[in-house]
């Protein structure tokens, strides 16, 4: 019951639910605000939920001390967003100036879809660069020269810090453990990159413009991203809210893309009759895009997880079925939602898995590698029933990846 009230309040905070029971205080009698605050921190939704609190009558709002803490954290989130918007545009322009096409993945590009972008807790700058691994290594060295450092190189990106901002330069936006699905995923990425690097959006606070993924690409890619994190560590409601906006933006993005294509073909709709015809054809266009997206999800092995995520979006954020890109899968969805509630942001708060987390001593020496790998196997076994292809492939991929890292370090 408590979670149901939380879900409704999140919808109220996002502006998608009227919330009369919150405005008149009837749902908040004896409400445990401290517990809700802890929930908001665990799920990295402090700024989002503050949007709802700011609309409440004073009589039903949190006590002054808690309210001030909440407000100060929200203001800090807002300041970080302002800084990161400017930093994102700065890094994007530097990469473009170096001669590479690129686009911003997730992050501030996702924030731009929010009603109040400043309420979303920001992360780092993820950039997909259309270049070879060797070129991206050189690019990372160039960016790190300005008050920065190279942090690490992984299979799909190089992480660096420049002017205090964490940046990931991606060779590819991601990978899958199943080799067949991974091959298809990489092919899909290669076929998609040009369109993503041409799709310009304006970041909030008049920070400037950057390239960001199209709506139809995001519907598949960000679902893959959630699936990947679900297997390797976990996902939280912050990531779910991001994907909620991706789905809401899907239909609008499809129509905008269609109109841009028609403009490029000099097919401007000048007469009222033309506009009427365009309106009639909008629904089939959206349906065709959904079918194309569903085909991609099936081909990439994401169909079952898509159904689970649609269930979570419906239960937590009230997503209507007509907006969904796949039918709800209740069994997988209930398991996913339970893991989200237990684990919080990227699974970092899941006490069920505390035994497997990496630990470090004062010198930064890792003691938890064994526990980390056992935890991976434990997660694979838990998910085997519902996602067998990835669960069975993950241990094999991990061995291959260990060899890949060893080989990279020899270079």
Where are these regions (language model features)?
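Arg/Gly-rich low-complexity intrinsically disordered repeat tracts
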Residues: 249-295
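Conserved NTP-donor binding/palm subdomain of two-metal-ion nucleotidyltransferases/polymerases, i.e.
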Residues: 1-123, 129-251, 292-411
